[in-house]
Amino acid sequence: MSTFSKIDILWNTVKYLKPIQWRYRAKLWWQRVFPQNLQSLDTTPDRQILNFVPSIPNEITYLGDNTFQFLNLQKSFGEQVDWEFVEFGRLWGYNLNYFEFLNQKGMDVREGKKLIQDFIQHFPKARMGMEPYPLSLRSINWIRFLSCNGINDVDIDAVLYAQLNLLIHKLEYHL
C-alpha cells in the first residue's frame, strides 16, 4: 500500500471526528507517553459488603497453578503471572487483566486472593489493562469476588480504590 493511500485512509477516518474526540485523543496520547503514578492511595475507603444475586458462573479460564486459557490459547506462567503478557495478542492480555476467572465455578478463594495480591505487586508499574474498560471490568470482578467470599483486606481495598479513582479521570470521549 502506498504512502498516499495510507494518508487518504487516515484522512477519511479522522475527518469525521468531533473536536471533543480530537481533544481526548490528544489527552490519551499524552497519558500513554507520560503515564500517571499508579501507586495506591494512602486513604482507606469506607467499605460495605454487597449481596450479589447468584448468576451464571463465568467460563472456566483459570486452570490452576497460574495457567490460563483465553481464546483457545493456553499459557502457564510458573511462579508469577506476567500481567503485561502480549505474546498471544493484546486481546488475550486484556482477558487476563479482566479477572473474570475470579467468578468461575469452583474457583478456590485462597487462589483467587493470591492472584489479586500478585496483581497488586505488579500494579505500580502496570501499563496493560489501564484503559477504562479493563479497569472497570476488573474492578467489578474484584468487588463481586470479595463480597461473595466475605474478604475484607485493607491492601486489596486500597488498590481497588486507586483503580476506581484512576477510572474517574479516564473518560472515553476519544471513541
Question: Which functions belong to the PLM regions below?
Answer:
Residues 77-86:
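Repeat-mediated protein-protein interaction surfaces in helical alpha-solenoids
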Residues 8, 42, 46, 65, ...:
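Acidic-enriched, low-complexity/disordered segments with a strong bias for Aspartate over Glutamate
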